[in-house]
Amino acid sequence: MVCCAAINAVRLLFKTSRKQFFSTTAGSLQTAVATQEIILSAGALHSPKILQLSGIAPAPLLTNIGINVTVNLPGVGENLQDHLFGLTLASLNPGIPANSDLVNATFDAAQRDLHYAKRKGELFPSRWTDTIAEALSFIPLYNFTKADLANNLISSIEANSTQYLHDSIDSAVVAGYEKQTALIASMHSKGSTAAMELLYVDGGRSVVNILMHPLSRGTVSVTSSDPFAPPAIDPRYFSHPYDGQVLVESLRFNRKLLATAPIQALGAIETLPGTATESDADILSFIKGVTSTEYHYVGTCAMLPKALGGVVDAKLKVYGVDGLRVVDASIMPLLPSAHTQATVYAIAEKAADIILGHSVEGRQYLVINPRSWDHNA
């Protein structure tokens, strides 16, 4: 295993002896022999690329660029998902602490002294670990939209969402997407999942909304047999209208939040997009202009039945290939209504048990309660 090295994976080579070779480059072409298994953990953007270069991919894609088909697996590189965000910016009264204050060395040193000595100051309790937000929440659809609008949004999920997929998509991937949308609609109807994450940033100067369960689906595809060429990444953001509609309603919710008495007491005045931006079309246009990736890419080597566009089975094994597993965010068939980092940790933990043949039943875990720590030690 080579970690954090400047190595570019080229392809997996398959021999009749069933040994598998992992070719890499680090200035020169090198070959590593795997006597048991290969564990592919290149992430949701590069795991599908390596599989495609190895001939494990939708056959039409490989044929078009002259790569021999090892396994026709339509789901490789499909089902790309990402968390998108919109935001509202506001100005506050002078003197209210801002994140930029922590860049001031004198201020920062004084606040650190207060934090360590008295557990007081701007670093306590939340700003000590503040990198993005002072507070966040995960909000179900019915909690930030009116009931009739939420019902309409859920109906739009259930009403032929497949029309918004790209034209050349395989029928197996379409079938898997239909299962996904049915599950998303059910979770929203029950209120058992969040539709939006809200981040309260910089004392309220920025309120950020992140779409938890987008319906748009993108692709990752190699464009040639050149292993050093980057893959073509098409996230197809906003290709399903539901995604934009939820973010529009999220921004309207921000305005309600900024209008509450506690935040108005801070002198909050919306500055972006500005109160003149009122229609759904104008708000959506603004959101499309500011949105960007959250780098929460998942789904391109999904753990699903092969008939539903799956790439790996429940034991992380790639369909149709001996001794090859994928262990990274690409196996998630759906984005969680949360950040993906902890889920990736869980995937790795579970993968270790699967590969070693361990059962998680009866295992004992060390539970640490941070409240019991001696912070003065």
Question: How does the language model describe each region?
Answer:
Residues 21-90, 94-95, 206-262, 286-377:
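C-terminal structured subdomain/cap of oxidoreductase catalytic cores
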Residues 31-36, 148-155, 233-234, 275:
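Short amphipathic beta-strand/extended segments with alternating polar/hydrophobic composition
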Residues 2-23, 78:
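A conserved short coil-to-beta-strand element within the FAD-binding core of flavoproteins
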Residues 12-13, 25-28, 145-148:
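Short, solvent-exposed loop/turn segments that connect beta-strands within catalytic domains
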